[in-house]
């Protein structure tokens, strides 16, 4: 096997997909070319570059988005401070104007007696006049009623007495006369009856005696006795027939009936006694009271009052509140200034760090690009350069260079979330870049800082408001209490003075009425009492003179006292009450007549209190003086909060738009990926069908098909016949950084079409076989050939013990330029490509690990392991790239196979020489073909070695030679060579 230095690339992937490179700045181990332009070039650069350098960036670093946000918030805070000053001035003016209005209101309240006195005096005068007129009318009606009642009573009782006495006397007399006559007749009849009764009784007694004596005679007649009955003589009694009543009784009654009085004289005298005083009294009352008028001008009128108290207002709490609000804004500005200084320092440090990262990223990107471009040009792969200079790659490079922190955060974020695909990482990076755009950050920083400042100001204002509200409220509460007391004193003094004067006038009028008008009532009632007494006395005298000495005198006196005496006593009591209450008693004016009640005072002084104190709310504010200041300041803060909240809302909208864009991109790429997979699957099926057709249609196609169908399976058991233990893998350089995702597609791999995958026994072999290739089946047991080292330093020579086989391998006349793959890594027919400058090799992965990673199985110990495990082949390093250290170097090497020789359990794809005409000698038959042995024919070239000796591996026969120098022959490049990657 010989080294072929025309391909440098990463090992191929077993997945059928395009290999995506990681961000360019991760390639941090490749140094730039010495001939390229560098920032540290010894040539003196111009003073001003077309881009901003470190000094310019450090100069502009303080002017950052957070600083602008802080300045905006500071401007709003300064505006709030000015607003607080204006609010304090406005509050003072409002307080003074409210105090002036309160003085006017208090003066008006204190002058209420002056305004109330005029109307009160008129009303008092009218009430007194109406009272007097009403009293006169009542007295007139009362006197008339009493007069008529007395007259009616007198007439009634007079007629009653006359009729009753006539009825009584005349009826009694008639009864007596009739009674006398009946008594006389009764007495006469009685006497006659008595006479007859007596006579009949005596006759009966005589009869009884005769009967009794006869009975006795009958009894005693037996004895012969005989008694004579006694006999009583019957008297005549003639005197009883002439008994009668005396005639004087009847004569006296008849005489009394003829002499009864008529009481006409008593009636006339009583009428004269009743009508005369009543008529006189009514005439006097009407003449005096009917024309009575009370003059209201005699009542006093209090003077107007002027109340002043504004000079007692203490506005120092307002000044203290204004100073406190200014201090809040001042300390807020100081805090913002300190934060701004910190932000400026952080901005300077950030710009310096970003500059360093950007410079390093540019250097690493340039070095990597130059190295990859040289490799691509050496392989003739211009498409690789085009991929590097694509707009997407350049934009990614600029973004990563300008925003290293965003890229760092994006990578860490993806790493923690387990995001491994490149497109998902790109979407995360795009979202962070979208959210970290200066416009978005300006909205976010300004909104957050503004809300924090508004919140802090609101907390401080609330804490200050409770203290100063209580202070100013206490001061104004004392002032309002003084105002209330002052108004109360003024109104009380005015009311007392007014009531005293008014009562004096009212009492004077009352005395005049009682002395000049109602004294006649006293006279009239006394006269009426005398009249009634005279009437009763006259009636008694009349009855005494009439019935004196008769049995009717006492009953009539009792009757008159019962019927008339009680009524007269009641009338006398009424007249006595009138006499005792016949006077005017006007109500005097109270001392608080012009004073307001407590609820009226509160209603009048409420505007004054509210103008000073305002209506308090639960948060310490209100519409008072302090409440006005606090409310204006809080209203200003509320407007700022709305502004800053709107800015945060704008950032939230930006976030939502970014998430929607990422979601849309994810769904769209997933749909596109599914479509690509479908198309690739269809294309792969078609290619496989075409491959099978080509393999069957070409020369010897049937034999190839049969050979492929009967080819033994690849497994690790073919290496078990060798007991050589594997050589340990060389240690890796601890300073080297491996990033497989950062490797670009190989030039050889990217220049040929997509490989075709043919699945064979669970191992995928990407390859392209020329239709002229033909293999024959082999029935020999397949074993790997041990790898031996040769001493020939020439890498273009091949050592073999069987000259027929080596001659056969060197005299192949057919030469193809098709790129074909063998096994599972990028292999092609060696076509004598131009060499490329060598890269410094670095042991990265051992043969066993590499084999396990490529083929999915472990490598058994074999003779080839001991020589292959430590083999590092490298081309000679050119002088112009001697100082370039390449990490993870890969080199293409060449495998020379003879026709129909074994290789990893299968036959070589190299067809027999065309000159043999398809006939096979016994040496080349399946039963006689020797195994191929891979030997080393050169030394290892290190990255800094000046030795030009190189190593070459070649297949030899199964029979080993004794140790020592072996004959070698010059390797002839032929179509029977397969190039593959080794590292």
UniProtKB/Swiss-Prot annotation:
InterPro entries: PRM1. Its main location: membrane. Glycans are attached at residues 35, 242, 257, 286, 295, 306, 493, 529, 585. Residues 674-693, 751-760 have a biased composition (Basic and acidic residues). The chain crosses the membrane at residues 58-78, 160-180, 333-353, 441-461, 642-662. Residues 79-159, 354-440, 663-983 are cytoplasmic. GO terms for biological process: plasma membrane fusion involved in cytogamy. Residues 775-792 have a biased composition (Low complexity). Residues 1-57, 181-332, 462-641 are extracellular. Keywords: Cell membrane, Conjugation, Glycoprotein, Membrane, Transmembrane, Transmembrane helix. It is found in: Cell membrane. Residues 674-704, 729-813, 902-976 are annotated as: Disordered. Residues 798-813, 945-955, 967-976 have a biased composition (Polar residues). Belongs to the PRM1 family. Involved in cell fusion during mating by stabilizing the plasma membrane fusion event. This is Plasma membrane fusion protein PRM1. The gene is PRM1.
């Amino acid at each position: 096997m010989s080294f072929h230095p025309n391909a440098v690339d990463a090992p191929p992937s077993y997945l059928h997909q395009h290999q995506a490179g990681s961000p360019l700045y991760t390639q941090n181990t490749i140094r730039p070319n010495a001939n390229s332009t560098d920032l540290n070039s010894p040539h003196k650069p111009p003073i001003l570059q077309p881009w901003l350098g470190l000094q310019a960036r450090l100069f502009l670093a303080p002017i950052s988005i957070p600083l602008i946000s802080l300045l905006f918030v500071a401007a709003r805070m300064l505006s709030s401070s000015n607003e607080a000053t204006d609010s304090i001035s406005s509050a003072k003016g409002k307080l003074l104007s409210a105090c002036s209005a309160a003085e006017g209101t208090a003066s008006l309240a204190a002058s209420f007696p002056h305004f109330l006195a005029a109307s009160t005096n008129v009303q008092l005068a009218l009430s007194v006049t109406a009272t007097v007129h009403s009293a006169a009318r009542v007295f007139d009606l009362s006197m008339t009623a009493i007069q008529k009642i007395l007259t009616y009573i007198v007439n009634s009782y007079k007629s009653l007495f006359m009729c009753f006495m006539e009825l009584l006397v005349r009826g009694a007399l008639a009864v007596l006369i009739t009674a006398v006559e009946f008594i006389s007749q009764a007495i006469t009849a009685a006497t006659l009856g008595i006479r007859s009764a007596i006579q009949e009784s005596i006759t009966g007694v005589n009869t009884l005696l005769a009967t009794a004596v006869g009975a006795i005679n009958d009894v005693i007649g037996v004895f012969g006795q005989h008694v004579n009955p006694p006999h009583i003589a019957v008297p005549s009694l003639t005197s009883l027939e002439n008994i009668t009543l005396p005639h004087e009784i009847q004569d006296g009654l008849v005489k009394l009936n003829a002499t009864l009085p008529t009481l006409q004289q008593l009636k006339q005298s009583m009428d004269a006694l009743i009508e005369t005083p009543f008529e006189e009294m009514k005439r006097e009352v009407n003449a005096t009271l009917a024309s009575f008028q009370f003059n209201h001008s005699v009542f006093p009128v209090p003077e107007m009052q002027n109340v002043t108290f504004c000079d007692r207002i203490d506005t120092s709490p307002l000044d203290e509140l204004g100073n406190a609000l200014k201090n809040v804004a001042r300390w807020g500005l100081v805090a913002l200034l300190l934060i701004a200084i910190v932000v400026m320092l952080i901005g300077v440090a950030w710009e310096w760090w970003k500059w360093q990262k950007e410079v390093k990223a540019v250097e690493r990107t340039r070095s990597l690009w130059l190295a990859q471009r040289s490799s691509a040009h050496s392989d003739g792969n211009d498409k690789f350069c085009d991929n590097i200079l694509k707009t997407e790659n350049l934009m990614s490079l600029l973004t990563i260079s300008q925003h290293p922190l965003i890229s760092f955060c994006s990578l860490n974020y993806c790493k923690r979330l387990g995001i491994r695909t490149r497109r998902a990482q790109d979407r995360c990076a795009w979202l962070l870049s979208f959210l970290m755009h200066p416009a978005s950050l300006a909205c976010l920083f300004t909104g957050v800082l503004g809300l924090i400042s508004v919140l802090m100001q609101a907390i401080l204002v609330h804490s200050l408001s409770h203290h100063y509200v209580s202070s100013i409220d206490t001061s104004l509460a004392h002032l309002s209490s003084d105002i209330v007391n002052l108004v109360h004193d003024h109104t009380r003094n005015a009311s007392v003075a007014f009531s005293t004067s008014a009562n004096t006038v009212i009492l004077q009028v009352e005395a005049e009425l009682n002395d000049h008008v109602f004294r006649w009532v006293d006279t009239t009632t006394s006269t009426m009492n005398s009249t009634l007494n005279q009437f009763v006395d006259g009636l008694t005298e009349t009855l005494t003179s009439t019935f004196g000495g008769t049995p009717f005198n006492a009953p009539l006196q009792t009757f008159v006292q019962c019927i008339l005496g009680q009524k007269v006593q009641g009338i006398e009591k009424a007249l006595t009450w009138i006499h005792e209450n016949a006077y005017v008693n006007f109500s005097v004016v109270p001392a608080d007549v012009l004073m307001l009640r407590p609820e009226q005072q509160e209603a009048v002084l409420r505007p004054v209190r509210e103008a000073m104190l305002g209506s308090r709310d639960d948060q310490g504010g209100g519409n008072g003086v302090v409440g006005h200041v606090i409310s204006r300041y809080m209203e200003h803060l509320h407007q700022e909060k709305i502004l800053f909240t709107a800015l945060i809302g704008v950032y939230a909208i930006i976030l939502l738009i970014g998430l929607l864009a990422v979601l849309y991109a994810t769904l769209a790429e997933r749909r596109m990926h599914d479509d690509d997979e479908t198309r690739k699957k269809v294309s792969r099926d078609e290619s496989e069908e075409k491959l099978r057709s080509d393999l069957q249609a070409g020369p010897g196609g049937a034999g190839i098909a049969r050979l492929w169908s009967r080819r033994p399976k690849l497994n690790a058991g073919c290496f078990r016949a060798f007991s050589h233990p594997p050589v340990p893998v060389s240690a890796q350089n601890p300073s080297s950084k491996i990033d497989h995702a950062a490797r670009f597609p190989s030039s050889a791999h990217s220049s040929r079409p997509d490989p075709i995958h043919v699945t064979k026994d669970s191992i995928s072999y990407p390859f392209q076989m020329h239709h002229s290739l033909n293999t024959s089946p082999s029935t020999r047991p397949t074993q790997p050939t041990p790898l031996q080292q040769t001493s020939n330093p020439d890498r273009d020579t091949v050592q073999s013990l069987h000259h027929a086989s080596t001659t056969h391998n060197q005299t192949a006349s057919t030469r193809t330029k098709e790129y074909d793959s063998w096994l599972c890594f990028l292999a092609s027919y060696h076509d004598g490509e131009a060499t490329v400058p060598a890269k410094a090799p670095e042991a990265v992965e051992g043969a066993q690990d590499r084999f396990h990673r490529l083929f999915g199985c472990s490598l058994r110990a074999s003779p080839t392991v001991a020589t292959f495990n430590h083999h590092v082949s490298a081309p000679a390093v050119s002088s112009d790239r001697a100082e370039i250290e390449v990490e993870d170097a890969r080199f293409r090497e060449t495998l020379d196979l003879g026709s129909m020789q074994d290789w990893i359990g299968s036959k070589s794809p190299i067809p027999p020489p065309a000159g043999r005409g398809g006939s096979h000698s016994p040496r080349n038959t399946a039963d006689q073909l020797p195994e191929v042995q891979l030997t080393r024919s050169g030394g290892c070239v290190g990255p800094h070695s000046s030795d030009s000796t190189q190593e070459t591996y070649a297949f030899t026969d199964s029979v080993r030679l004794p140790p020592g120098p072996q004959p070698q022959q010059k390797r002839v490049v032929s179509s029977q060579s397969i190039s593959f990657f080794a590292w």
